[in-house]
C-alpha cells in the first residue's frame, strides 16, 4: 500500500488525556458499524476501564470491534477483563507475545508501537497517547505531556485501508486480497492536506525519518520539534545543524524530567554538537514529555507515535500523519511556544558537559553504541511476528441429566 496526499480534511489537535480520551470514547459511543483500535499500552486502571466500558457497550449493540495490543507493552490485563470483551464479540489480539524469563519480559525489540483508532471509516485518531491514567494531570507530577489528532475526511479512508492491509502477521497473499476491498469513500468538509506515513520492517523502514529529513532540507524560517526520546542518527543531526547554519530557527524540546534516566543521559550527549551548531535546545521540566510532534515554517506539521530514537526509527512499527494546514500549524506552534515559555529551561553553554577526555570518551562510546544498537539487534535471529487472538470464554454447559430435568420441568433445581 502506498498512500498519497489527501485534501479536504478536518483536523483537531488533542493535548493529553483530558482532551484525547473524551474524544475517543465519544466516537466509540457513536460507532454504528466498525471500530479498529491499536495501542502499545492498555492498563487496567480508571482510564483503561473507561475504554473497556466503551468497547463493551459498542460490541453489545452490534458494532464490530477489533483490538490489537502489543504483547510487551500490555502484558498484564486480567483474564476477566479481556474475557468480558471477547464474550461480547470483540476481536482481541496481542502482537508477538512472549513468555517471561525469570519473571522478566524478554520481547523488547520490534514492537507494535502505533496508537490508532478508526471508527466507521468516518473518524480516526492517531498520536502518542496510550490508555492509562499516566496521561491525566490527576496522576500527579509524573503525568505525561502528549499529543494526538482527531481526523475527519478522505484521510480516514487511507488509515482504514492501512489497518486492513497491514495487520501484523498477515500473509502477502491476504494483503493482496485486501487491496480489492477498498474503504468506502468519506467526504467531509475541510481544507487540510494530510498524508499517512508509517514504519515497518518490510518496505517502509525509513519513511518517517525521510519525511523529517525532507522537512529540515526545505525549512526556511523555523522548525520546532518536541520529542520524548531524542537520539537520532548522523543524517538527522547533520540536517538539524545545517538548517540552523543557513538561518533557520531550530527549537528542540526534549525531556528534562524523563521517565527513564538513560533518556536524559543519551540526549545530553548531543548538547555540545547541537547547541554549538546553532540549535536552541529546551528541557521540558514540568513533567515527563511523551509527545512526538514537529512543525516547519507556517504550513507543515507531524503528529504520531514515532520517537526520534533507534527503537522507533529502526525497529518498531510506527505511524504518523504529515499535515499541510496553516491553521493547524499555528495551533501547534502556539501550544509548543507556550510550554517553552512556561515550562522549559533553555540549554546554554554554561550547562554543557565539560569537554574532558573522560567525558568525550564516554560520549563517543555511548553515542556509537546507541546508534549501532539496531544493527546489533538485527543480528539476532529474525522471526515472523505472531498474533495471538484471545478466544471467547467457553460457555458453561449443563450435564445431560440436568438438561433432561430442565426440559421436563422448565427449570433447573
Label the model's feature ranges:
Residues 1-413:
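Charged, low-complexity intrinsically disordered terminal segments
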Amino acid at each position: 500500500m502506498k498512500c498519497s496526499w489527501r485534501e479536504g480534511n478536518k483536523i483537531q489537535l488533542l493535548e493529553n488525556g483530558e482532551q484525547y480520551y473524551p474524544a475517543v470514547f465519544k466516537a466509540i459511543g457513536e460507532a454504528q458499524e466498525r471500530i479498529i483500535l491499536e495501542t502499545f499500552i492498555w492498563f487496567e486502571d480508571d482510564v483503561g476501564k473507561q475504554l473497556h466500558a466503551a468497547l463493551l457497550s459498542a460490541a453489545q449493540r452490534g458494532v464490530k470491534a477489533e483490538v490489537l495490543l502489543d504483547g510487551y507493552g500490555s502484558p498484564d490485563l486480567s483474564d476477566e477483563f479481556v474475557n468480558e470483551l471477547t464474550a461480547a464479540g470483540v476481536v482481541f489480539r496481542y502482537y508477538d507475545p512472549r513468555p517471561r524469563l525469570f519473571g522478566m519480559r524478554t520481547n523488547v525489540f520490534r514492537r507494535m508501537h502505533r496508537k490508532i483508532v478508526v471508527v466507521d471509516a468516518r473518524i480516526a485518531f492517531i498520536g502518542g497517547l496510550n490508555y492509562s491514567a499516566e496521561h491525566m494531570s490527576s496522576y500527579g507530577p509524573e503525568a505525561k505531556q502528549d499529543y494526538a489528532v482527531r481526523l475527519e475526511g478522505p484521510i480516514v479512508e487511507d488509515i482504514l485501508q492501512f489497518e486492513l492491509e497491514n495487520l501484523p502477521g498477515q500473509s502477502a497473499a491476504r494483503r493482496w486480497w485486501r487491496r480489492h476491498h477498498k474503504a468506502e469513500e468519506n467526504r467531509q468538509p475541510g481544507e487540510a492536506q494530510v498524508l499517512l506515513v508509517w514504519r515497518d520492517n518490510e518496505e517502509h523502514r525509513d519513511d518517517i525519518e525521510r519525511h523529517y529529513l525532507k522537512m529540515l532540507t526545505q525549512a526556511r524560517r523555523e522548525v520546532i520539534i518536541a520529542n520524548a526520546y531524542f537520539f537520532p542518527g548522523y543524517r538527522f543531526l547533520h540536517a538539524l545543524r545545517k538548517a540552523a547554519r543557513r538561518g533557520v530557527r531550530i527549537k528542540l524540546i526534549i525531556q528534562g524530567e524523563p521517565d527513564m534516566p538513560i533518556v536524559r543521559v543519551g540526549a545530553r550527549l548531543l548538547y555540545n554538537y547541537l547547541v554549538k551548531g546553532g540549535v536552541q535546545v529546551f528541557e521540558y521540566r514540568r513533567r515527563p514529555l511523551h509527545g512526538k510532534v514537529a512543525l516547519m515554517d507556517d504550513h507543515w506539521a507531524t503528529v504520531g507515535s514515532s520517537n526520534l530514537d533507534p527503537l522507533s526509527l529502526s525497529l518498531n512499527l510506527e505511524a504518523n500523519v504529515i499535515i499541510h494546514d496553516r491553521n493547524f500549524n499555528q495551533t501547534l506552534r502556539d501550544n509548543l511556544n507556550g510550554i517553552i515559555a512556561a515550562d522549559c529551561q533553555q540549554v546554554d553553554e554554561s550547562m554543557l558537559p565539560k569537554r574532558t577526555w573522560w567525558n568525550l570518551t564516554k560520549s563517543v562510546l555511548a553515542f556509537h553504541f546507541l546508534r549501532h544498537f539496531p544493527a546489533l539487534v538485527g543480528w539476532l535471529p529474525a522471526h515472523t511476528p505472531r498474533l495471538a487472538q484471545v478466544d471467547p470464554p467457553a460457555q458453561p454447559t449443563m450435564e445431560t441429566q440436568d438438561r433432561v430435568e430442565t426440559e421436563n420441568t422448565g427449570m433447573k433445581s
